[in-house]
Amino acid sequence: MALYEHVLLARQDISQQQVDALVEQFKGVLEANGGKFGKVENWGLRPLTYRIKKNRKAYYTLVNIDAPAAAVAEMERQMRINEDVLRFLTVRVEEHEEGQSAMLTRRDDRRERDGDDRPRRREGGFDRGDRGDRGPRRPRDNEAGEGA
């Protein structure tokens, strides 16, 4: 059987329990066709880059799947029918990653910071020093007369 990673986006106006029920429903479809679910990661309610079916946010869920192609095709068909599923993406992989996905580790990194995610500047105001792409500075007219 082939290994897949599957990301599911569910509508924002349903609860997290309903999202979990959706995942269980699709798990049943997959197992009925000879597949197995691996780890399930709920990424929570996140903003979308653009509106999808009048939704600005969606519940993201990542699922590792070990199933034949026919089982995955049937699960995707069921997702197209379901109104609570906004989008989904299934990608075939060579092996599943161990531990947390990159999305969850990035979220944990943000929590470890002090809550301020602005880039830090060097002290000293507006002067950032010489850029190095200009030649030496010519003296101004009033500077040349003072020195002589």
Curated annotation (Swiss-Prot):
Family stated for the protein in its record: Belongs to the bacterial ribosomal protein bS6 family.
Purpose: Binds together with bS18 to 16S ribosomal RNA.
Gene Ontology molecular function, alphabetical: small ribosomal subunit rRNA binding; structural constituent of ribosome
Family annotation (InterPro entries): Ribosomal_bS6 (IPR000529), Ribosomal_bS6_sf (IPR035980), Ribosomal_S6_plastid/chlpt (IPR020814), Transl_elong_EF1B/ribsomal_bS6 (IPR014717)
Entry keyword Nucleus: no
Disordered: annotated segments: 96-148
Gene: rpsF
Gene Ontology BP, a term: translation
Taxonomic source organism: Brucella abortus (strain 2308)
Name of the molecule in the record: Small ribosomal subunit protein bS6
